[in-house]
């Protein structure tokens, strides 16, 4: 199973045309059920679009763009350039449909514009990472336009004190990165602050970045640069279990900070190494994967029976989504736990390992990866994680 094998699966089943978004899941022939305009406007089944194929449009498309840009850098294929263009336009759309500046939609409904009101940092941040990586590449022919898009989002987030806006004026998702003392929150604050400097070349922005690096966040113990160096294992213990997928985009941001900020090379390299060590432990979960063990019904509409009006309250909206998510897993997609928590966790861990800047970690990770992927029935897999497997092979090359 080489890179082209996974690439074909991704583009034949999981890229949504004409919008250029990578789906969360699809049927074996690429079929998916999209919400209507009415369902989006009523936030049915929930305002976070959990359980829908468009749930992670900005997240997964952003990560995939990042990987394909690496593929293009290595091989300069016109086909890869065309694919990146399709996905970049998809990311543009997720910004263009917003009413509130700084909001990035998760995906769009069947009309190509309707969307759910609650975003998340796991959508905004991969979007930012992808667009900045594209901006730096020689594929970008509209630097002024891409810079303007990035700064619109970055400056809006700073205006909101680094909180993620919903597409409802005055409504925000979770707390501020400015107050965060967790690894992910700190990395996101530092990366975005540094990007504002890189895009504006305003020395005051660089001074602010240095100030953030050297200061202790509210209720924290360590300076932010120390928190960065500690890696994501602490976040896993306190918040996410062993799930690497939610930490991968911030890990990649540290890889970018290593290029942008040589003054803190030691902290960034220690972070990447530490993450690689943690990832190496998590890759072994792939050995527990079972191709059988439950179905995956792509028709999510029965979740609408559990719908309630979230009344523009993000806590209520999340509670509704969580209740539906449990029902979805138990009754509609029992195999998703195996696909996501077992296989997905291992694949994202492999991606972290091959970008750890440590040859020993990368080599061992790929030994496990290449040995185990051949027994996975990829054609019956409903989650779009073939894109992660492809990305691992791109960065290992």
Give the ranges of each region predicted by the language model:
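Terminal, non-catalytic domain-edge segments
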Residues: 1-17, 137-141, 148, 244-397
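Low-complexity, Ser/Thr/Pro/Gly-enriched N-terminal "stalk/linker" regions
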Residues: 1-59, 85-86, 90-107, 141-168, ...
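Carbohydrate-binding/catalytic loop surfaces
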Residues: 19-53, 100-120, 166-188, 226-259, ...
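Non-membrane alpha-helical segments in proteins
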Residues: 53-73, 86, 109, 113, ...
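TPR repeat positional signature
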Residues: 60-61, 68, 131, 186-189, ...
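Short glycine/serine- and small hydrophobic-enriched flexible loop segments
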Residues: 65-74, 129-136, 194-198, 252-259
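Aromatic-rich surface patch/π-platform used for binding flat ligands and interfaces
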Residues: 95-103, 121-126, 130
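Elongated scaffolding segments in large macromolecular assemblies
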Residues: 142-291
């Amino acid at each position: 199973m080489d890179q082209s094998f996974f690439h074909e699966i991704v583009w034949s089943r999981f890229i949504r045309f004409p919008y250029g978004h990578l789906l969360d899941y699809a049927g074996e022939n690429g079929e998916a059920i999209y919400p209507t305009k009415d369902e989006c406007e009523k936030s049915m089944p929930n305002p976070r679009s959990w359980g829908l194929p468009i749930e992670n449009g900005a997240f997964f498309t952003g990560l995939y763009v990042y990987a394909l840009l690496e593929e293009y850098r290595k091989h300069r294929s016109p086909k890869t350039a065309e694919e990146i263009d399709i996905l970049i336009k998809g990311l543009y759309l997720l910004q263009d449909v917003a009413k509130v500046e700084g909001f990035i939609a998760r995906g769009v409904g069947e009309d190509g514009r309707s969307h759910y009101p609650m975003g998340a940092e796991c959508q905004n941040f991969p979007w930012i990472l992808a667009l900045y990586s594209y901006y730096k590449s020689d594929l970008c022919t509209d630097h002024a336009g891409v810079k303007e898009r990035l700064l619109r989002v970055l400056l809006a987030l700073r205006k909101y004190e680094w909180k993620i806006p919903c597409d409802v004026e005055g409504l925000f998702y979770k707390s501020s990165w400015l107050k965060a003392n967790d690894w992910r929150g700190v990395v996101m604050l530092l990366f975005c602050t540094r990007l504002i400097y890189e895009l504006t070349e305003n020395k005051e922005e660089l001074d602010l970045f240095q100030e953030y690096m050297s200061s202790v966040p509210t209720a924290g113990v360590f300076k932010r640069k120390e928190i960065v160096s500690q890696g994501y294992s602490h976040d896993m213990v306190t918040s996410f279990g062993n799930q690497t997928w939610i930490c991968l985009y911030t890990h990649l941001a540290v890889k970018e900070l290593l290029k942008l900020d040589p003054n803190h090379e030691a902290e960034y390299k220690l972070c990447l190494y530490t993450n690689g060590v943690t990832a190496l432990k998590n890759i072994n979960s792939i050995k527990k994967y079972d191709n059988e063990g439950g179905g995956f019904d792509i028709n999510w509409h029965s979740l609408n029976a559990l719908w309630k009006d979230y009344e523009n309250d993000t806590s209520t909206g999340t509670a509704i989504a969580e209740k539906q998510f449990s029902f979805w897993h138990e009754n509609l997609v029992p195999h998703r736990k195996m696909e996501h928590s077992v296989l997905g966790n291992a694949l994202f861990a492999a991606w972290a390992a091959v970008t750890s800047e440590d040859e020993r970690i990368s080599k061992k990770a790929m030994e496990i990866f290449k040995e185990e992927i051949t027994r996975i029935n990829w054609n019956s897999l409903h989650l779009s994680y073939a894109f992660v497997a492809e990305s691992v092979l791109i960065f290992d090359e």
